[in-house]
């Protein structure tokens, strides 16, 4: 995805109060051990499972995580909401630094694909967006997997278990930045602190006018099962401190002292151990030593959209032809492992504007912002940068130009599934410099991302060898389906309509900054899209959930791997599709909450 990467913020971390890293001292060392449950991956899903399963004091749980607390790598930088944009491509030991295979839809170039390597996973470094998916998407989910427990009404209780909501701070937000939401859709006491940023971007107040001008209705913060419209964005931030609320902050730290929970950081899963057709544990390495962790009840893979299928394949569960290629003994021929990968796609547009944005947050203004955040948890650093969002179906005048195949594919989606998404970014975004250059260019800049959230392109994840030490082969295959081309062209034009509307004219300075006024014809726009489009790093569905009759299904509706006992997959790879919404993180939290209950109720 395109992200802001303000160089001024990268240089300012030393001015922040450094968060404590003493928690690392209580992390256990790897050794041959036996637990009731072993969870591979201490990310967004894995830590939810660890928290909920250890609520039963008679149950022992180990979490295997290659990373550590992000504070041990970059101090407290990940805790600061405004710093979220700097992590993609930063090449810190906080990410896996994956690169895709050459992408046919992008002129055969590879692109970076960021995945966190840390306790908390991508919840440590993403944009913290919080929102549910649509009611229709839930019904489709239930239908595809043959399980009505996935309908919206049945999943609401799990959504609410993820949320500890605090109302917006009206004293610190702009007077014209009051969010709309219904308290019936919120809850307290859940794992993640959720609120609206204490600081509202002026740029976003104007974008709201632009989106209204092109016909988007006002929405209620996207936590009511309706995704069509525009709204201020709920985020995973602690209202009282202005600190990011992640899986490790909300689900792990509060239960670190539980004696039945063991965290094995700096530990790499190498191979699933089988006893016949049952998983019995996992072979891991830590500091050059190899150990065996035995799971008496279940082994649960929560290693993410790339490494959960990779671990299955190197262990002998996957497409037989691929396993044979690397002389991997076949435990179970499951053709769907690593298939069906899907991701949202996006391109940016930028303008110079007559309101203060983050593009000029440097020097004394940055020092003031740091002081305010350290003292009160408010100000520009308490804002994640993407605090406003719009979603819609492509309007009729654009649909008239869609290909017949596009129309057919989109007609299969629920009526309430938006196809296009528009995100704000309070700085410039270009192909050569991702944000933060306002102080160099002179002036303030604002951007919007034009995105497709009903993508039809499908990719895959494969293996390069029989070893987890070799990175997986990641082929999202983005921008290859004609539907995605039709939709992204529409999204681009709709963003232009909003930003060039009379409603936004009072703050716009000059012509479009990026890609610029010379990009006008459909051919020119398509050239720009091909050169610039990127995945959102929202990869899903590589261990697809589905009915036993679905040849691509890897797991059933309980997360259990078909044909293998005592083995589940619970993470972004588990979904039957990539659900629409502000961002899919909350769907992963919610699935983990649901399947934690399922695991607790399983009789062994």
UniProtKB/Swiss-Prot annotation:
Reading the lineage from the top rank, the first entry is Eukaryota
Q: Which UniProt keywords apply?
A: FAD, Flavoprotein, Glycoprotein, Oxidoreductase, Signal
Q: Which residues are glycosylated?
A: 32, 76, 97, 260, 265, 401, 460
Q: Which residues form the signal peptide?
A: 1-24
Annotated InterPro entries? FAD/NAD-bd_sf (IPR036188), GMC_OxRdtase (IPR012132), GMC_OxRdtase_N (IPR000172), GMC_OxRtase_C (IPR007867)
Q: Which cofactor does it need?
A: FAD
Which of this chain's residues are annotated to bind FAD? Answer: 44-45, 65-66, 126-129, 572, 584-585
EC number(s) of the enzyme? 1.1.-.-
Report whether Ribonucleoprotein shows up as a keyword of the record: no
* Catalytic residues, chain numbering: 538
Protein family (similarity comment): Belongs to the GMC oxidoreductase family.
Q: Subunit structure of this entry?
A: Homodimer.
What is this protein's function per UniProt? Oxidoreductase; part of the gene cluster that mediates the biosynthesis of the phthalide-terpenoid hybrid 11'-O-desmethylfendlerol. MfmG seems not to be involved directly in the biosynthesis of 11'-O-desmethylfendlerol and its role has still to be determined. The biosynthesis of 11'-O-desmethylfendlerol begins with the NR-PKS mfmB that forms 3,5-dimethylorsellinic acid (DMOA), which is then transformed into the phthalide 5,7-dihydroxy-4-(hydroxymethyl)-6-methylphthalide by the cytochrome P450 monooxygenase mfmA and the hydrolase mfmC.
- What protein am I looking at? Glucose-methanol-choline family oxidoreductase mfmG
Q: What organism does the UniProt record list as the source?
A: Annulohypoxylon moriforme (Filamentous fungus)
Point out the gene that encodes the protein.
mfmG
């Amino acid at each position: 995805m395109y992200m802001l990467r303000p160089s001024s913020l990268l240089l300012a971390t030393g001015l922040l109060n450094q968060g404590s890293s003493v928690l690392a001292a209580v992390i256990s060392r790897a050794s041959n051990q036996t637990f009731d449950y072993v969870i591979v991956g201490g990310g967004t899903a894995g830590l939810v499972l660890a928290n909920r399963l250890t609520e039963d004091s008679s149950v022992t749980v180990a979490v295997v995580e290659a990373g550590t607390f992000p504070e041990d790598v970059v101090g407290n930088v990940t805790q600061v909401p405004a710093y979220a944009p700097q992590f993609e491509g930063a090449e810190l030991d906080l990410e896996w630094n994956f690169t895709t295979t050459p992408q046919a839809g992008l002129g055969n170039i590879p692109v970076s694909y960021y995945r966190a390597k840390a306790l908390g996973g991508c919840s440590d470094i993403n944009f913290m967006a919080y929102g549910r998916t649509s009611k229709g998407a839930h019904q489709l989910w239930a239908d595809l997997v043959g399980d009505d427990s996935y309908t919206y009404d049945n999943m609401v209780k799990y959504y609410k278990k993820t949320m500890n909501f605090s109302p917006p701070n009206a004293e610190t937000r702009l007077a014209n930045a009051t969010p709309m939401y219904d308290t019936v859709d919120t809850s307290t006491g859940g794992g993640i602190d959720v609120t609206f940023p204490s600081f509202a971007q002026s740029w976003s107040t104007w974008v709201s006018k632009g989106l209204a001008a092109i016909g988007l209705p006002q929405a209620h913060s996207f936590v009511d099962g309706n995704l069509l419209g525009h709204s201020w964005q709920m985020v995973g931030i602690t209202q009282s401190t202005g600190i990011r609320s992640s899986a490790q902050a909300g689900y792990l730290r509060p239960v670190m002292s539980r004696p039945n929970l063991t965290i094995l950081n700096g530990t790499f899963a190498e191979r699933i151990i089988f006893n016949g057709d049952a998983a019995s544990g996992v072979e891991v390495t830590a500091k050059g030593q190899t150990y065996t962790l035995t799971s008496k009840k279940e082994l649960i893979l929560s290693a993410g959209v790339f490494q959960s299928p990779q671990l299955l394949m190197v262990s002998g569960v996957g497409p037989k032809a691929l396993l044979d290629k690397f002389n991997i003994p076949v435990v179970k021929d499951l053709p769907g492992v690593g298939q069906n990968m899907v991701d949202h796609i996006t391109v940016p547009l930028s303008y110079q504007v007559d309101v203060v944005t983050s593009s000029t947050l440097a020097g004394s203004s940055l020092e003031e912002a740091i002081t305010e955040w350290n003292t009160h948890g408010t100000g520009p650093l308490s804002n994640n940068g993407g605090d406003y969002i719009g979603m819609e179906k492509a309007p009729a005048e654009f649909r008239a130009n869609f290909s017949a195949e596009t129309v057919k594919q989109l007609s299969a989606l629920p009526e309430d599934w938006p196809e296009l998404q528009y995100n704000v970014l309070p700085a410039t975004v270009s192909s050569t410099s991702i944000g933060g250059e306002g102080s160099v260019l002179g002036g303030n800049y604002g951007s919007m991302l034009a995105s497709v959230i009903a993508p039809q392109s499908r990719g895959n994840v494969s293996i390069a060898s029989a070893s987890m030490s070799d990175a997986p082969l990641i082929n999202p295959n983005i921008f290859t389906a004609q539907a995605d081309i039709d939709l992204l062209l529409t999204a681009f034009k709709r963003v232009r309509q909003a930003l060039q509307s009379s409603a936004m004219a009072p703050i716009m300075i000059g012509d479009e900054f990026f890609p610029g006024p010379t990009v006008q014809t459909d051919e020119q726009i398509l050239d720009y899209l091909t050169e610039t489009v990127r995945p959102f790093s929202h990869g899903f569905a590589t261990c697809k959930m589905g009915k036993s009759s679905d040849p691509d299904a890897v797991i059933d509706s309980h997360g259990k791997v078909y044909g293998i006992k005592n083995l589940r997959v619970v993470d972004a790879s588990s979904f039957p599709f990539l659900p629409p919404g502000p961002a899919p993180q909350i769907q992963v939290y919610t699935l983990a909450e649901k399947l934690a209950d399922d695991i607790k109720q399983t009789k062994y």
